[in-house]
Amino acid sequence: MSKESKITLIGSKLAKTGGEFIYLGEIEECKNCKFKRLCHGNLEVGRKYKIVSVRSANHPCIVHEGGVKVVEVVLADLTIMIESKKALEGVVLNHEPITCDNFDCEYYSFCNSEGIKEGEKYKIKQVLNEKINCPFGNSLKKVIVELVENK
């Protein structure tokens, strides 16, 4: 997927350039809001976005204390865990989540990453040189990836 930017609204207290968030979708309080389309119309549920610019105007919002600001966002890069043998910079792969139910593991959130779905294509931008001690003995590497369009 390209790094094309989208315009949306986010709580003023969260509106900081470089900030990242996962869009969780519309809530009941948004149903009759005049800004509903701008807040929710451009984003995909479950995706992680990075704020690249913040506009100064503040708008009222019944959900966000302090109102909301207009922000420009792009899809954020993701840090995920993959099998070591597949961890090569520049490679494009289909996402295969690491099967793990050890919620207490320090790596759990990387093996079960939010923002990417099983089967989606991604490109490895960087292999992180970090020693991973998987409690189940899996040979894993932490990588930074960007989503790519399925063609």
Swiss-Prot record:
It comes from the Archaea. Pfam families: UPF0179. Belongs to the UPF0179 family. This is UPF0179 protein MJ1627. It comes from Methanocaldococcus jannaschii (strain ATCC 43067 / DSM 2661 / JAL-1 / JCM 10045 / NBRC 100440).
